[in-house]
Amino acid sequence: KIAMVLWRGETNVEQGFRAYFDENSIPVDLTIYDTARDLSRVPAIIDQIRKDPPDLVYTWGTGITSSVVGKYDAVDPAQNITDLPVVYVMVSSPWKTGIAAPAGQSRPNVTGATHIAPLAAQINAIRAYRPMDKLGVVYNSREDNSVSNVADLTELGREMGFEVLAAPLGTDGEPSQDDIAPAVAELARKGADILYIGPDNFIGNYRDTLTDAGFANGLAAFSATELEVRDGHAMLGLVSRYELVGRLAASKVEQILIDGISPADIPVETLDRFSYLIRLSSARKLKLYPPLSLLDYAEVIE
């Protein structure tokens, strides 16, 4: 029996999760708790889970996971789930955000599957398509995962020879969709070569606003997550397929519930292969066609 605490209902991640158990003939009873993008609902969901405890809790995303399990060095048994195994998905930087314990340590009841390709590989993916010296990033300054991602990119820029042009939203209150287009225009004015969409729930919700502003300013968008290319208009991405992330998480659940392995002994992992996606309609719109060499291994979406 598994309780699933989700950010925006079921996604392809959960389809992959379910498929893994179906294909391996493992019966599972899933109870869905949908926060509908509202983290304030999590405490009530935790109360419900405690009233009828499942065998395991599945959490989706950094915000929900952090609320459910706390940070590794600041767990509050009154607020966080400590007595049930928890497997998380779609946490982009579990170590940076304190959800995963530092190298050499583990958490007694928590493990998970992360989905972001190494940043250097992402930059190489952009440069395989076109030259890039200035990376434009519009992000929600109120999301820990976005802030840590921009900090890591800035540091990497010093090593790999590019400048991060950051446009934080929400520095003086909640971010607004109306702030996105002016931020993109400002990045274009500063000479950004491409827009970067990292793991950011706010930008994910308004991805079309961002890419439309990009088109208006002659800027393509690169995405580190699948949704923005497959269901949006980002021109390219180096991504984990959501369905495969779900299967990876399911394999960890199987280790815990069927094989009796402690979550502490199951490493937090990412997929070992990523997909290079190109959205051709966006390339056409911007007249930025992919080099032929990319077509040998990229998945081209019309």
Regions found by a protein language model. Give the residues of each.
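Short hydrophobic alpha-helices and adjacent helix-cap/hinge residues
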Residues: 1-302
